[in-house]
Amino acid sequence: MVASSTSNVNNATAINADSTDGATRRLSFAKIHEPLDVPNLLALQTDSFDWLVGNERWQARVAKAVEEGDLSVATSSGLSDIFEEISPIEDFQGTMSLSFSDPEFADPKYTMAECKDRDATYSAPLYVKAEFMNNNTGEIKQQTVFMGDFPLMTEKGTFVVNGTERVVVSQLVRSPGAYFERTADKTSDKDIFTAKIIPSRGAWFELEIDKRDQVGVRLDRKRKQSVTVLLKALGWTEGQILEEFGQYDSMRATLEKDATETREDALLDIYRKLRPGEPPTVEAAQSLLDNLYFNSKRYDLAKVGRYKINRKLGIDRSLGDKEASVLHVEDIVAMIKFLVALHAGEKTLTGKRDGQDHELRVEIDDIDHFGNRRIRAVGELIENQVRTGLSRMERVVRERMTTQDVEAITPQTLINIRPVVAAIKEFFGTSQLSQFMDQNNPLSGLTHKRRLSALGPGGLSRDRAGMEVRDVHPSHYGRMCPIETPEGPNIGLIGSLASYGRINPFGFIETPYRLVSEGVVSDEVQYLTADDEAEVLIAQANAPLDENKKFAEETVLVRARGGGGEPVLVPAADVEFMDVSPRQMVSVATALIPFLEHDDANRALMGANMQRQAVPLVRSEAPFVGTGMERAAAVDAGDVVIAKKAGVVTEVSAELVIMLNDDGTETNYRINKFARSNQGNCYNHRVLVSEGQRLEVGGIIADGPATDQGELALGKNLLVAFMSWEGHNFEDAIILSQRIVAEDVLSSIHIEEHEIDARDTKLGAEEITRDIPNVSEEVLAGLDERGIIHIGAEVEAGDILVGKVTPKGETELTPEERLLRAIFGEKSREVRDTSLKVPHGESGTVIGVRVFDRDNDDELPPGVNQLVRVYVAAKRKITDGDKLAGRHGNKGVISKILPIEDMPFLADGTPVDIVLNPLGVPGRMNVGQVLETHLGWVAKTGWKIEGEPEWVKQLPNLPRESGSTTVATPVFDGAREEEITGLLDSTNVTRDGDRLINSSGKTRLFDGRSGEPFPDPISVGYMYILKLHHLVDDKIHARSTGPYSMITQQPLGGKAQFGGQRFGEMEVWALEAYGAAYTLQELLTIKSDDIHGRVKVYEAIVKGENIPEPGVPESFKVLIKEMQSLCLNVEVLSTDGTTIEMRDSDDAVFTAAEELGIDLSRAEPSSVEEV
């Protein structure tokens, strides 16, 4: 057993509890040595963006790769690639050209914190060298041109756009390249073979062998034609065709049917099929063909497409070659050859790879294989947007070249940067892949940045995605987590990068393996893509090794090609690679589930997803039973403040820590206090260091939300008992102890932001003021002289936060009034109260106020003079109706909170905290929660092992005795059942000398109400419980009178609209079944949309009279109008046959009001806010 903070790499000893990096001492049950630490978990985002902008970090990486002789790394940044690609822009005659080079960034205008505060975008100005050349005179003009503000990525892998943090999700798309497929023909028993080349952009090239064995080609998705016609058009003669393809019957048959003789005939034939109705000429046909596949402006395979075609077809064309991105005749010939060989049933072909002859496997492709799907990460997604913007700009430049005077032209006059800026803005603001960051807790942010989505532009759509795309594929191993994916319509389309996965320069996901030679496993690590992996034999990480790192057994289980994803046994000497770690196949969130190997996959999926919904609590507590992944997750999520350089702390305050580094420099670390996250949670940092303390690089300065001593801490360790209690925990309901409420164990702080602006209206400017008409002084008591609530005020629903008045329309004045007005000056204008009030169901304490004013030179949207933001924080204690969950997909709702004295208690008098239903375990098959409970008890009570039992020999590093501690049981390499039972038998005894729980994991519990023992022993232990972001306070809702829908006049629905509850079809059936006619009539009329009736009823209730007869519902009138619009004349008749006049709803209100004597001139609330 190894003890370490993050992984079991250092096989030495446990990190000291008093070590400077604040890591808690975790005792690990891992038995497998791992040669590789978990990599930086945000590299997926940061590396990609570094490549795009070509910053110093990226340059350092390139220099290192070149030094190591790795040639696959791109040596030019993404932006410089695009500018090089678009240059030169020439006018239509080719007399002038404009080219761009050397993009570089100036310093950002605001820091990230200022951007969040001001609702600005965190960006830096981009400048490019532009060179205009007049080819006639040879004159050159150079200028540095501003190309707009370019959003920058923060250190945490996010973007700040308009003041909110956003994440750009990586996209999983089909890779450009050559693909071969076989489909059964519907009309005959033959198979149809198809091949296609998919470019990064440009026309598709498709080949097909039909049931008559004719080889056809389809250019640019148009009509099919004979492939020999194409070959002749490309300059081949019949003799050459026969020489190359003579041995294949299908090609000979196709050639016999081909009527064209010469190259010209073939070109004209192709032109007629592609452009029917246009007069064909040889020149037009030639240029059409060239533009389709051989012109780099129109067609681009991208490096990855060229790489895939080279590998598939055995072509040896350099990737750096200028012409590599377009098709060549040899590509088309190799493509045809591969397809006819596949059709003829051949198994191999000879091709070239890396300059050597290579046997190519002739087989069809699996679209869902990760060798054929690649990742478009942030850098590439933004690059594509900039490319779109620049190509729009290119058109403008061309037009301006022709219209402007040649002498006066400078690069600046030609360029219009609007399309570029617009394209970037559009991407960050509206793209499906640029998402509002999930900041529920550090793990949810980390997972969001590591998400892989098959949706989005150029990807799949939910409705069209079949089962195959969503399914787990053997090639996902170590690349995409088979467990973490959403439930619902997106299942399988959105995944999460596996913990050790990384992305190579072509966009394929690689995963690391240890090299094995002749049965000896080395610590040297090599990264393989899914394609490379298909060729080799790979052993699992848990294959037993002896002390010389040799396989302990003769035969080893490996994953091999042709095994159909099933493992096979091979001799140890044949194994070539071995997994680096047992948790290699799962994502970070899944790797945080202890005893994952004992949980059913469906429940593990829920467990991984629910950890992301855990709310940060007032006090975080690390789990007794972890997996050793907690530290890496918390640190890489970026919500913990860590030391960038080694040094000594010189100054500490709540908001700032200053360190004097060993190299003589000083670093300031800002500490967040009670900030609001995107999800309205409280993101607060707590300083852990003291003045004079020394820290090494990576040492922890402050804990963030849901972290404890630098470890992820999403919930609380609670004492659970698995038993039923009076049926109150039926169907996953949970019983909780009052102690949890009283001691704020599961309390969390939530911060809401309320904002109001004062604008210019047609009738005059709105004003933020304390002087509000018809409002009593006690209502205004909390407001200061500006009319804004003061910090620290306790507010309830309906209280005024910011006083604001809006001018009302003035009525036409009589001549007398005008005269008086002229003599005595202006009477006070009519205004109405439009103050910002606390919404329904919310309350709390005001913790912050921000005022932005045009007069103080704050940037505000047009028409806005002032903007006020008020932050209200509320402490939410746990209450019945809140949702709790464990880490194994075991979730439930609190049904009852019992007084401490009524809770079942242990023999030493300790009451349990939470009672769960034991029936929640067997059917769900998540036994991991039971093992966690037992091991949690062991970790909390500590142990003392006597003698040398068999199970201890597996764990040489386990301390023989220990007090209360935390343990790690890594995924697929954790504590075994016999180890847990052994430790349960060795737990420390109480002061009475009793061991409360023995190896069965069960104990006698006593009923808190009677003090009697329960008849059977009950499982008791510590489980880690999370409070999820589904709080009953956010869901509970009641309506008195509120807004109505415009057309039907029925109450709106939903909490957001302050709506009513829908009395639906089934509820109506229930009333019909009881014959409750009057209740039903009320629901259809006066309680809903009988306008006249509801006004009358209101009055009757106020005056204490009987309820009047209901009238005609408004929706019935709408129905009649709809039928009239279909030209059906509908009349409503009374019982005596006379026609009833349907008055319009507007009239009905006024008539009703008149009859009732109600004054309707008072302002009625028109919106939810005003209610």
UniProtKB/Swiss-Prot annotation:
SS bond partners: none
InterPro entries, alphabetized: DNA-dir_RNA_pol_bsu_ext_1_sf, DNA-dir_RNA_pol_bsu_external_1, DNA-dir_RNA_pol_su2, DNA-dir_RNAP_su2_dom, DNA-dir_RNAP_su2_hyb_sf, RNA_pol_bsu_bac, RNA_pol_bsu_CS, RNA_pol_bsu_protrusion
Superkingdom: Bacteria
The reaction(s) this protein catalyses: RNA(n) + a ribonucleoside 5'-triphosphate = RNA(n+1) + diphosphate
MF annotations from Gene Ontology: DNA binding; DNA-directed RNA polymerase activity; ribonucleoside binding
GO biological process: DNA-templated transcription
One GO term describing the cellular component: DNA-directed RNA polymerase complex
General function of this protein: DNA-dependent RNA polymerase catalyzes the transcription of DNA into RNA using the four ribonucleoside triphosphates as substrates.
Family stated for the protein in its record: Belongs to the RNA polymerase beta chain family.
Name of the protein in question: DNA-directed RNA polymerase subunit beta
Organism, scientific name: Arthrobacter sp. (strain FB24)
Gene that encodes the chain: rpoB
